[in-house]
Amino acid sequence: MGFDLDEDILQDFLVEAGEILELLQEQLVELENNPDDANLLNAIFRGFHTVKGGAGFLSLTELVDACHGAENVFDILRTGKRRVTAELMDVILQALDAVNAMFADVQNREPLTPADPAIIEALHRLSMPESEDEQAHHAAAEPEPEAEISMEEFDAV
């Protein structure tokens, strides 16, 4: 990548994307505790979308690819076609690490090191609606709630 771009545009990107990436880190930690928070899912989606847009404007293709993959995962999450799982969080955190590493490359005016292709592939897979097999696996992993009984039934026991 040539850094002969307008330095003002690059500086604007570095400031805005830097703030968004810091916020994304905090939001992902919060998501682990609140995986069904629609506002949070939308905010994370917008964060990756905004960084992707700025990176695209600057022709930072490798950064665009990683952000686009994460953005697609959050698009499917916010439409309810997939649920947040431990595996999904691991992949998203790895993707954010790759995005942060590329962001550091941009800050240092160095060529970008693309994300591991396995991360991009995992993002692509996780951006598809949850399969019936995955749904069955999640259902089996969740314990059945204990039945509630009335006081009359309890007294009868």
Residue ranges and their predicted role:
Residues M1-V157:
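Non-catalytic helical tethers at domain boundaries
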